[in-house]
Amino acid sequence: MTTKISILQRSLLSAIALLVCNFAIGQTLVSGQLNSGRIPTPTMLFMNVTPDARSAAMGDAGVAISSDVNAIYWNPAKLASADKDLGFAISYTPWLRNLVNDMALYNIAGYKKTAKGQAFGFSINYFDQGLFQATTATGTSAGNFNSKEYALTVSHARKLSNTLSLGLNLKYINSNLLGNYQGAGTSAMQPAQTVAADLSLYWNNTSEKNWNYTYGLMLSNISGKVSYGGLDKNFIPTNLRAGIAAVKNVDDKNKLTFTLDLNKLMVPTPTKTDPTGSNSSAIGGIFGSLFDAEDGFGEELKEFTTSLGAEYLFNNTFALRGGFFNETEMKGNRKYFTFGVGLKLDQKYGFDFAYLVPTGTSSPLANTLRVTLLAAINNDTPKK
């Protein structure tokens, strides 16, 4: 399917960036008002789209739940606590499938535990945005473009104590929206690229009590601003996520997990008079994003999203999952329920499925599904 893009904006980059932001995050903007809720709109938003089916089924919560290979995305510190020595996963998400048929997100991840409470991992995150047809202001075709974005990530996790671990991701990100296209009166487009880092902590309060609590904290996509050509510089989606998970082993075969994640984009809030955002530096934008909302602390709180999730695991083989994601109306109004199942075979191979059901009737995210295939090998080395 080919999607037409009319180059009518003053800046081609701004038009494309807003299109991608609104589709990728499913934001609802008030008709006739440009970003009336002052929604932060960084570029490369695919970096904040949930890649795996397990967390997707739990309301997009994952920073504090038990570790698996997809901890590379949610909280790499959890890799040091993984109960397997080696793991791999492949995930597939057809994106906006109610609107188009050629957009998809792919993710490949793997990790290896080593001695002394350490682990190393990698992931490849690829977002195929399909074929776009650009047109000039007069409607003349300016060519077809296959828009794509990807991130290559390497991870390291280390236990600092029996309960606390630290994680680090280093990643290369590339965003190619329209190749080298140049419209009338605009600078030539070029792929945006950058190097970014993630930092995370994971605390596992292991105990013999009825409930076990785990905590996670993650600051992701720490990087400079990027450009698609010309003088404009754009923030990438630096993100702060904190969460807690409560785990109860009902008996030898039944296990319950409940989790809560709070999430905030650490980029400047666009002002009432300047909907394009701030000219501050990337680091200044991270720290300033906690205090820059024009309506004060109340508006800052509205920029947090909430993810609630639950998982029932039977005999470490079959899982039922559910969750709810909530975003305030002013800052995007994404609200949806999530459901999913998981299946393990021979304690080595796994299959996860997730399905999204929005609360509204016109969400572009309606009927989003995700599929993940996993493989893991038992850890035969003594735990440190």
Protein language model annotation of sequence segments:
Residues 1-29:
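Bacterial Sec-dependent N-terminal signal peptides
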